[in-house]
């Protein structure tokens, strides 16, 4: 009996996107054909919705997207947030204090903007590269700013809806040390979605939490849904749907929790090859 799948949800970095940070042409063409056949496509990513917009220029999602690891559900069709779970101010204070002590670059994601912070005189290449990928209207609206780290102490977080704080470090060994300090802060969760990054959110937030909010907004059926991902932050959503696919380049934890593992990685049309076989579409 042919599996019933109506909805396809894709992580972005390391999954739908190649290492060149864009979806591959063969995969794009194939997914657009699936959309014509009635499949519903959307994304579930640690990225801010502002940093998803450039991908929507290749593939327009049929459903609202799960952004900030599940903290924000954003509908590009209506340009509005449908659901949001923010970090409490009493949690943000000790997080900010810790980050300033560490003197590492970081980003604050809100429902409207991304605020990046870097050491004065020491540009953070990852921050600069990410900022260069934003598209209109976010460029004109100045929705991604990069500021001196010293300005973070003056950031008025009490007036912002903060969905995620992203630590960026070139020293992978620091992450385990940082998490020990984060364990002492109440009502937060964290996950390392990439080797150089640590995502900090509200304690209830993960991609499965975001999926539940998407279900409530759209009526999406998780039993007719397939999710693709590659990272540790995909584990919860893998376990919340009928079918899950870890990319060939995925983490060990992602592969252990997936229904399937793709034969090819994100740089070799892994999604295209898997779906062509799974759906038996020529």
Curated annotation (Swiss-Prot):
Magnesium keyword on record: yes
Source taxon at top rank: Bacteria
GO MF assignments: magnesium ion binding; phosphatase activity
Cellular component terms per the entry's GO annotation: cytosol
Keywords linked to the UniProt accession: Hydrolase, Magnesium, Metal-binding
One Pfam family linked to the record: Hydrolase_3
Name assigned to this protein: Putative phosphatase MPN_383
Record organism: Mycoplasma pneumoniae (strain ATCC 29342 / M129 / Subtype 1)
């Amino acid at each position: 009996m042919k599996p019933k799948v109506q909805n396809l949800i894709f992580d972005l970095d390391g999954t739908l996107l190649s290492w060149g940070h864009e979806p591959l042409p063969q995969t794009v063409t194939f997914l657009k054909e699936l959309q014509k056949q009635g499949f519903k496509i959307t994304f579930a990513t640690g990225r801010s919705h502002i940093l998803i917009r450039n991908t929507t220029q290749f593939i327009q999602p049929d459903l609202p997207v799960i952004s900030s690891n599940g903290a924000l559900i954003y509908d590009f069709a209506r340009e509005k947030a449908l659901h949001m779970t923010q970090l409490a101010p009493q949690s943000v204070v000790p997080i900010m204090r810790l980050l300033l002590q560490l003197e590492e670059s970081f980003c604050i994601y809100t429902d409207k903007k991304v605020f990046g912070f870097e050491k004065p005189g020491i540009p953070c290449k990852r921050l600069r590269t990410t900022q260069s990928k934003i598209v209109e209207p976010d460029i004109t609206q100045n929705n991604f700013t990069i500021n001196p780290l010293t300005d973070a102490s003056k950031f008025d977080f009490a007036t912002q809806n903060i969905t995620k704080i992203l630590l960026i470090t070139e020293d992978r060994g620091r992450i385990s040390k940082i998490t020990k300090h984060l364990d002492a802060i109440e009502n937060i969760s964290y996950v390392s979605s990439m080797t150089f990054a640590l995502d900090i959110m509200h304690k209830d937030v993960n991609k499965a939490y975001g999926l539940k909010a998407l279900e409530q907004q759209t009526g999406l059926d998780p039993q007719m849904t397939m999710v693709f991902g590659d990272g540790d932050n995909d584990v919860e959503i893998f376990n919340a749907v009928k079918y899950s696919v870890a990319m060939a380049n995925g983490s060990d934890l992602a592969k252990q929790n997936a229904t399937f593992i793709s034969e090819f990685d994100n740089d070799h049309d892994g999604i295209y090859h898997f779906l062509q076989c799974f759906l038996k579409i020529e």
